[in-house]
Amino acid sequence: MTESNFRPKILIFAAEMAYRAADAAGLTKAEYPSNTYYIRIPCSSLIRPDLILYAFKKGFDGVLVASSGDDCPFMGEACIEKTSKRAEKAYELLEQNGIERERFKVAGICSTCVEALRKQIQDLNETLQSLGPIKTA
């Protein structure tokens, strides 16, 4: 595939509330890039850094963790701190493996934040377009 017709694949780990926004986006037929794949998770703080790296090694060009933030029904406000710590470890792991940190993003998305989710996906998609295909071993 040439870089001119590059269409990045984005994996979204969507926590409980953020997944509701994704579901609402589908129900309202909100437009966003169709090159996204969702994995529903109970809480963003459960995502291990090695799973982020694994997604890249399996061919994804970008990963978005859509967190419920302090709306998390499982951890409440503690979700933000734990997710942030895991994200920092993921950034370190990506750097050690030669993967640009711009390919990984964490965002707090509430259950009714369809537009915020769409914008996060669009922004990541544009970043990935400018970076081009991922180069992993």
Language-model segments: what does each one mean?
Residues 1-137:
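Iron-sulfur-associated redox domains of electron-transfer enzymes in respiratory
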